[in-house]
Design a protein with these regions (language model features):
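Cell-wall glycan-active module
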Residues: 1-73, 160, 168-204
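Amphipathic alpha-helical interaction surfaces
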Residues: 7-10, 14, 77, 91-94, ...
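Surface-exposed patches in mature extracellular/periplasmic domains of secreted proteins
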Residues: 16-20, 79-87, 100, 145-156, ...
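Glycine- and small hydrophobic-enriched segments that form the cores of compact globular domains
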Residues: 48-103, 121
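Alpha-helical segment that forms one wall of the substrate-binding/catalytic cleft
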Residues: 65-77, 83, 109, 114-170
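Solvent-exposed loop/turn segments at secondary-structure junctions
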Residues: 91-96, 116-118, 158-162, 172-173, ...
């Protein structure tokens, strides 16, 4: 899956190349690829490269099937599609690989600001995957999901590119649930002024 992730990162950064590649794929493959390119491209356009690597603390994620069970439990309890929750976790911390707080002070695998966690975290531990996923579902539900996912996601992170990216990855998983396992294996990359740097995965 690492090679696919690398390809999507290249295509997300080059609209012309992406159009050529997508035009040569079959309909089904093109639809999946377009979702990934659109989602990655939105984030690429919004976030600038960094000059220095952030001091990330990283760890292996919980097993994929365990996370999937947590997503399903949250969907059953709050009515928020598991694919949306998985897409949020993918973007926020690469399925829990990043354990550092964000520059804004957001914490845990679903990246909650402490005040938001106090309101929607259900008394759980923001650093525990199950608690964080349930808290995210609770917050998205209170913010308008599932009837208005875009609005709910904008409450979660008020960046249009973020909403576009979450929606793109979630839609791809809705069409093909097995894509969750591909996304689960995506690694942590940092875009720097000198190029991409991979922080997790094979050989590291």
């Amino acid at each position: 899956m690492l090679h696919e992730q690398r390809i999507y990162r290249v295509l997300a950064a080059d609209d012309r190349l992406a159009a050529i590649v997508l035009g040569r794929l079959g309909a089904s493959a093109a639809r999946e690829a377009a979702s990934n390119v659109r989602a990655g491209g939105a984030l690429y356009d919004h976030f600038s490269p960094v000059k220095e690597l952030p001091d990330f603390r990283i760890r292996p994620p919980e097993p994929a099937d365990v996370l999937r069970r947590y997503f399903d439990q949250a969907q059953d309890r709050f009515g928020v599609d598991w694919e949306v929750l998985a897409a949020v976790m993918l973007i926020e911390t690469r399925m829990g690989r990043i354990v550092s707080n964000s520059s804004a002070g957001a914490q845990g695998p679903m990246q909650f600001i402490p005040s938001t966690w106090a309101a929607y975290g259900l008394g759980g531990d923001v650093h525990e995957e199950r608690d964080a996923i349930l808290g995210a579902a609770n917050y998205l539900s209170a913010s308008g999901a599932p009837s208005d996912y875009r609005g709910a996601l904008f409450h979660y992170n008020p960046v249009p590119a973020y909403v576009t990216a979450v929606t793109g990855y979630a839609n791809a998983m809705e069409r093909d649930p097995d894509l969750f396992y591909a996304y689960y294996n995506w690694q942590v990359f940092v875009r720097t002024t000198h190029g991409d740097v991979r922080l997790t995965g094979p050989g590291l």
